[in-house]
């Protein structure tokens, strides 16, 4: 039996967008549309779609490599019961996803974006990213805030509480500037933020002196 492009597209949508397992998808298509499609055929539909979109995915990778700013992350999940990692590299307009059994450099090298990326990469301080020397690094402030709050709650570090307020205040200033149609903060505000930030870092070092 032959199936048309609409059936195949709907099947791929159910699997990739709604995350419906093959057996449930098979049952859904049979119950709603009286289509007796095997799970093997459903997998074939997906593999064909993956092959068809390769030119588009390669174009996305190439565009991200040339971007001035990129974002990278890795999220653990399971493939057929085995631990794997979903790697993402994105810009404000494009996102590339690829699963890999490794979380580290073996995966990011195989994916091929970061070895050629020369812009600024925003990430979560995962050690793998620092192994790439052609790019600039920017660390995620959400992760900074989590670590700072942990220092406040677990170790009663006063400097960490001040840094939380500093980062959140800077974020609020950026949001207000954005709402006002500005693309950057005034130089005076930036200078003040830097001064407060540096003072808090100095306070933190005073609270936690380096060993002799």
Residue ranges and their predicted role:
Residues 1-212:
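Catalytic center-proximal scaffold of phosphoryl-transfer enzymes
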